[in-house]
């Protein structure tokens, strides 16, 4: 069973160098990075930094999209409650996915509280997310 660590803005592991240092410090091949595309992109990183880490260091991808600049006053609130469908934002998602290993597990982390509160049901929120993720993965 593998373990992953996640980079997030303003947290202890907040940049690729710290990710790599943590993985090397632990010294286990089953410790890898979870790439949360929102956190990665909003931290100013893209596919280039993922390629530099190497696909063997990537263990999981949490896929969502967002704008490059904040859409809410609180980053935490935006990350927890209002992410965007893959392809609806500004992140270089196709390039990020290309840097990941071909067999990486990809999960969707796309909370949409505003839509839920406006009466849009879970399946109607989920369908476009799954369709967009499939399209990205099939490129």
Please report, for each region that a protein language model flagged, where it lies by residue.
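Short, internal active-site loops enriched in acidic
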Residues: 9-11
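Histidine-acidic metal/acid-base catalytic patches
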Residues: 13-35, 41-139
């Amino acid at each position: 069973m593998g373990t992953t660590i996640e980079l997030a803005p303003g947290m202890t592991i907040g940049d690729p160098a710290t990710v790599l240092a943590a993985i090397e410090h632990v010294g286990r091949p089953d410790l890898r990075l979870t790439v949360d595309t929102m956190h990665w992109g909003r931290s100013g990183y893209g596919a280039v930094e993922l390629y530099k880490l190497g696909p063997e260091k990537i263990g999981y991808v949490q896929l969502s999209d967002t704008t490059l600049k904040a859409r809410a006053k609180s980053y935490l609130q935006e990350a927890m409650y209002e992410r965007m469908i893959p392809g609806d934002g500004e992140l270089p998602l196709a390039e990020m996915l290309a840097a990941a290993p071909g067999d990486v597990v990809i999960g969707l982390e796309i909370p949409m509280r505003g839509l839920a509160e406006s009466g849009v049901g879970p399946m109607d929120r989920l369908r476009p997310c799954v369709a967009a993720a499939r399209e990205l993965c099939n490129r």
